[in-house]
Amino acid sequence: MLAIPIIGFLVFTLYPMLWAIRLSWFYYTGVPSETHYVGWANFASVLKSKPFWQVFANTVLFAVMKMPIELTLALTIAVFVSGKRKGSGFFRTMYFMPYIISVAIVGVVFSNMFGYFGIINGLLVKLGILGEPLNWFAGKMSAMWMIVIASIWQTFGLNVLYFVSALNNVPRELYE
């Protein structure tokens, strides 16, 4: 019964991972005759490169921006939908739905919503909040916020699920 998943794991996860780790110690162009051992040189060149540190800083910034908002939002929603309330099953389904959508689809949806001619700009201009459409993706920080918002929208449902499970396991005597 477990043979098929284990074989799948070995073939599609473990073997490629070990092969990539092995290749990281070699100079490799895809041509076997040009491959030679370089040891720590690949790692040293990565740690010396500016793009690596820029990506690292962006990743830390993304996490610092996303996690407090996502966890606060997820806990707040979990408190409201935990327990046996009428309609809570519907809401649990609705907040979890974005989690099963592909990241690429989420990117397309948000780029269309927040694009220069997107629905958000159109709505804000019609309501008189903006005089002209905003280019949400033009600046570094505004683009980062758009990515954070899209990521929160997609993934907070799983955190809500975790919080609801935890809250439903709290004994009723502990509530005031």
Question: PLM features: what roles do these ranges have?
Answer:
Residues M1-E176:
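A structural signal for multi-pass alpha-helical bundles of membrane permease subunits
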